[in-house]
Amino acid sequence: MLVRAAFALLALLASTSIARAQSGEITVMAYAGIFQDKYTEAVIKPFMAKFPAVKVNYFSSGNSAQMLGTLRTQRSSPQVDVAILDVSVSNVGNKEGIFAKLDPAKVPSLKELHPMAIVPDGFGPAVTFDHWVLVYDTEKVKPAPTGLADLWDPRLKGQIGLSAMPNIQGIAATVLASKLAGEDFKTSIDGAIKRLKDLGPSVQTFDPQPDGYTLILGNTLTVASGWNARAQLYHDDSKGRLGVVFPKEGSVFQINTINHVAGSKNAEAATAFIEYALGREAQKRFTETMFYAPTNAKAEISPAAINRTAASAENMAKMIPLDWDWVTTIRDSWNNRWRREVIAGR
């Protein structure tokens, strides 16, 4: 009798938890623009169709640093339940107690993630992988560039947009320039800074606004740095005028993590959303919509889509490992060298 009663109580508690997860309102904070449009269509709307009693509000922000600033100001009374932002910034939030650890029992998709998607100590894992690329005007740049080394071609002088630090694209450019210089960026970037300083006079802008893709299509630049996912969309929208190059020197991952805000008002629904976003279905849909590489290793992505991401076998073999937690320890130093020696030195 007591055993039956105990099982009945457990069943009631489980059903109550599921009901909470399937009702209420949550706010997801993530990037503005194309990301918001595509993520809403590929992930948020299908989630709400699956859980019709849950309303998901999308709060857009320009970049990860702004998101962290917003969460800091709301710390005593969080208005956001889930935040998607760059891992180098979310790691800071983890250390400050802004984000809560996830319960693996409530997020079973954690078991299906790529090892590199796992964030230490149980915090929010990677939900997307992107990577650094070069983009160019296929009508004006012939032959097409094949890597970072081609930016020193005199033909491109005054036509280049290279996003500098503190933009994390600048970190990626530093790592690749170090490889060109034959040095290990973990011990020295002297060679990289020298190469980038030499490139300086050829760079029209170190801060492409609104971005390099738009400036190329608007005939202001012919070559720029960028991120693959957005570049692939602009490639399609421009009917191939914007070319996308995976650099022959390799590339580095840009990682977005999905995080449960500590003290959020609807923790159960927030956890349910995180589980859905990491699941095979949502990962497949978003990869095939916007060409971010999936973090769920069991998501079955179409070959046509996967070959346009860093997750293809050929591209994965050329990726350069980068510990973004380590990056936080050298970021200010690298930024100062860019500012003093590369940007001011041209």
Where would I find each of the regions flagged by the language model?
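Extracytoplasmic ligand-binding site segments that recognize negatively charged/polar headgroups
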Residues: 30-40, 64, 79-80, 84-220
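Early extracytoplasmic/lumenal segment of secretory-pathway proteins
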Residues: 22-89
